[in-house]
Amino acid sequence: MRIAVVVQRYGAEINGGAELHARYVAEHLARHAEVDVLTTCARDYVTWENELRAGVESINGVPVRRFPVARPRTPELFARHSATVFDQPHSLQDELAWLDSEGPTSPALLRYIETNAGTYDWFLFFSYRYHHAYHGSRAVAKKAVLVPTAERDATVGLAMFPPILRGVRALMFNSFEERAMLQHVAGARLPGVIVGIGSELPERPQPERFRQRFGVQDPFAIYVGRIDENKGCKELFAFFQQHIRNARGRMQLLLIGNSILPVPDHPMIRHLGFVSDEDKFDAMAAADVLIMPSYYESLSMVALEAWGLGTPVLANGRCDVLKGQCLRSNGGLFYESYSEFGEALGALASSPSIRRAMGRNGMAYFRRHYTWPVIERKYLQMFEQLAREPEGQQASMAPLPGYFARRKKVLPPGMKVLAGVPEGAVLQ
């Protein structure tokens, strides 16, 4: 079996959520099949500038084919197109122009997919909202499997995507909430399975090694990821500072990751910057609780890693996916206001027995659903199932409307469609 993993960026040093997801899946599927990665020469997700060399290289034993991006992203143009499709009645042509302006637009990548359709048994496309996934899925619909990595934002309200969701052979969902959201906007029951992603956790993390290396003695909560307002960090800083003004105790907040948002200059808040995987996992194992303040997630690998290490999670309950994961695992608490944040953090800080119980629950949940043998088996079983599927039972990709139909401004704003999508965690 030969599989092409198609993703917007790829590399050992590229750690975006979908890109890391794609790399992990590619490397693990390569143990069972012949895997090629098809990607662009972009390193930066804001500009899509061609910083990496076109051609073929090997990364961790997986062949990677890079294709140039035709043009960098222009933020002003993308913002104008986004305002049109998200906030105004518009046409399908407006949505296609938005997709082009978002990028990364690589005609060479799409030509390779079209001309090599017979070379691969399956094309595994990552991230439904990008140019390569939309046009690539249309080019090889009968071999297309989509990993949507969809978040609850206005993009899911665009009319261009339901035909793709209904027309690919299968979808590999990250969560029950993602599947429910996409099935609602597609107006159909979509073929696929909830799979998520595994993680390369150390067998024996050493919490004390982290404490000694970084001089940490007091109890602490930890945040791991990009320190950005879009990830909920501005609210996290406000809530945590209010909590330590109101509550007694010595719990610190430690931050691991690159900072886009300024970190408050406060004695109880400490930014460690970018650290090695060894230090990251030691830190997560040493923490009393991992805080996940993000409003938008399709899975949250960091929360799963915390549970895999036996650390409870405190999550933003306004993110349906995080709330659902906490409820299904019984490994964490969630909040939707400062008062709930303070009560939950106080309960976790003051009760080792609660932390231990939730940590055990989270670890059991991780081992049941997110170890790599489980993830690999779900992918391989899906490919085997699709290979056996009679051609008459396969979905077909609806063609794009004609010239004039594409230009009729009859589509509702993406934000309006999103407002009609049911919210809430899905309990299973």
Sequence positions of predicted segments:
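N-terminal subdomain of nucleotide-sugar transferases
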Residues: 1-68, 118, 240-243, 401-428
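Donor nucleotide-sugar binding/catalytic pocket of nucleotide-sugar-dependent glycosyltransferases
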Residues: 143-154, 161-206, 216, 223, ...
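Conserved donor-binding/catalytic core segment of Leloir-type glycosyltransferases
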Residues: 213-231, 237-241
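Nucleotide-activated donor-binding/catalytic signature segment of Leloir-type glycosyltransferases, i.e.
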Residues: 257-282, 289
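Aromatic "clamp/platform" in nucleotide-sugar-dependent glycosyltransferases that forms part
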Residues: 295
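Short hydrophobic beta-strand element within catalytic cores of glycosyltransferases
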Residues: 312-316
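C-terminal amphipathic helix plus adjacent low-complexity
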Residues: 363, 368, 373-428
